[in-house]
């Protein structure tokens, strides 16, 4: 091999997994595919009416594999996902030659997918070397009315539109694809030592867009820098942010792989005019007809993925929130269809924000998604102080519409003088139609308090009912057993599907005494299904880290590895391999266990608090490139000390920062370019004191 066995950034194997679902994905902010798969997906392009809405499948010209030259013996074959360059490499090596295929979704040119083939002569002979290519392409799609158009500058041309839009009367989205035809074989000539061929696929929403994007790619290809610019872009991304530990290689690889797959879905930092269509559980590479929910937007985006993105890339986080702003009209319609005021964000949404979940019960009852959406806006506001999003760009409309829905949805109980929320399904989907889900009701309270505080900041009137409901909504609590029942009538010992009550405290801000936090963790740890989704154990790990129990935290971190498949670190939704694959939701929860659990980071109105802890098997944690209030910050700690450094003021308006340490209340200036180290301590990163 090449030493990649010990490299946490490169994942290699001698053969591909027997299950093609677990093959690596290559994705950018516009296009996504799985290597050697017959389908490409385009961000925001769905086919099928409500209940059947799924990502439209475009046939993939990248579905090409190298084959061994005739008569080759002693062949070595490797398959590698290189997260450093965001590319997948297949290499065939014999005694006299090396042939390699590289596949990538171009990071700088998001409308472009590329595969290249390189052949190198390893001996002094001069015989031609011919490498066969096995291509499997048919210009057909079950989701698109496609037609073959005239060639364009030697490229094939396919164009058409989706068959059935999400809503009747909507325009049928157009798709235009140009690609370079692939020969049956490539030959290195007698006098050549090495050669590389590049094959481009370009996709756009119009013929003109596809042709313009091809012209841009061709210009880079002519200069010989098409791949270099892509790889350099990934290099800059990794140089600007990261999350690593001194610990087991498997943990380091899981962290790096999760960052790679999540960041693959985002635009390059600084990209202008990016329009987000949301982040789905299976990412852009998944979501075809038989896997429709993998491509829909759930709470997964707002609770599980968003906090990681916000910490490193606030501009991408803003674009994700803008998806919720753009689909607010659909959310308002959902609320109206249920008979309530305000916005009810869809349990599963696609282009319009209208409910596309094929089963009514989830759209009707899993209303906790509203609280997840509001929480994402709240965290963004605290972390960036970007009031423009709320004053001018629709953020206030989302927050206030969620508040209106909650006030319309609750019922007043004259018996116990509290507001109740009846007939809901909590995150624990084993229970439906319950009253007063504690998780949901805490989110209601949080959403309403934030709406009132935001109104005050923006100089807007505060609805009295918001605070009345927030202060008087029922939060179930058993004072005798000192824990929070999941809902009214929950009996201890009942099995639950996944993390639910244990989300109180983190990621949902809610004050808990250590005793109650511990009792919640112990109660639900004993009854959570081992078949539950991947992010569950990460949240138990966060809880135990809050309580300074590194051994129990490590147990739950380790449980997450049942969902990580080899060799390409593709996550599955469930430990038995079922459910969504390339499961970004599980990756997001796992990343939060390190990024928020180990560090103790909590985003608050006053600053970013920290309370670091190394789990068992980890001696050091390093976080680089978090972006707080326009400042780039590195944060690292061991069991004995903490080091902080503001590496740059990325925005001209960025304020000076300081670290306030607890319990001493010492204030340490964070001067850009100067590292500040101190004995292991909790504290807060905040604006410098006047």
Swiss-Prot record:
Superkingdom assignment: Eukaryota
Enzyme class: hydrolase
Sites where the protein binds substrate: 299-300, 497-498
Swiss-Prot/TrEMBL keywords: Glycosidase, Hydrolase
Annotated TM spans: none
Active site (record annotation): 429
GO cellular component, one term: cytosol
Reactions listed under catalytic activity: (5R)-5-O-[alpha-D-glucosyl-(1->2)-beta-D-galactosyl]-5-hydroxy-L-lysyl-[collagen] + H2O = (5R)-5-O-(beta-D-galactosyl)-5-hydroxy-L-lysyl-[collagen] + D-glucose
SUPFAM superfamilies for the chain: Six-hairpin glycosidases
Record GO biological process: carbohydrate metabolic process
EC numbers, comma separated: 3.2.1.107
GO terms of molecular function: protein-glucosylgalactosylhydroxylysine glucosidase activity
Classification via PANTHER family: GLYCOSYL HYDROLASE-RELATED, PROTEIN-GLUCOSYLGALACTOSYLHYDROXYLYSINE GLUCOSIDASE
Recorded family membership: Belongs to the glycosyl hydrolase 65 family.
Entry function: Catalyzes the hydrolysis of glucose from the disaccharide unit linked to hydroxylysine residues of collagen and collagen-like proteins.
Protein name: Protein-glucosylgalactosylhydroxylysine glucosidase
Lineage of producing organism: Eukaryota, Metazoa, Chordata, Craniata, Vertebrata
